[in-house]
């Protein structure tokens, strides 16, 4: 089991997951426009292209990664975002660690929780990015895409909990998440503080198995 360090580190994987989160949530936003969705697809494809050349050309891969993050953050600044990004912001604000560390953990669970209200959009994103190339029903395609996101966190060896977080921090993190989420266009499902706790509490180390 991997954990976040006690001070800020540059995680290429966390940077990747941050951009992936922003692009995914922008795509499935209820008011997302065609050009926004096209940008989200391009961002995810660019992220994967960067990782594909990382060993042979690390400098170019890093430049592509940073460009993808910049483009993803532009979508966020326009109001296209979601709860995973809002949770990532709250964790970053409290502990000064990369948003991507929290987003990598919560994004799959949030996407699953949306169920039928988002599976068509998730499936469309999966197909357009080439993540799921075969012709499957939306529900199956969406599940494969979400599983792929989980595999990215594992491949990057990113933490599955936030070491710095304590139970007493959760109310503040929920409040900050709700405040950040107000800036975004409607997500597929509206969540209140009680709903969000089910996604934020699992970030605690105490809620994880101690078996590595």
PLM region descriptions:
Residues 27-32, 113-120, 209-211:
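Short helix-capping/linker segments at secondary-structure and domain boundaries
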Residues 132-212:
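C-terminal charged capping/lid subdomain of soluble metabolic enzymes
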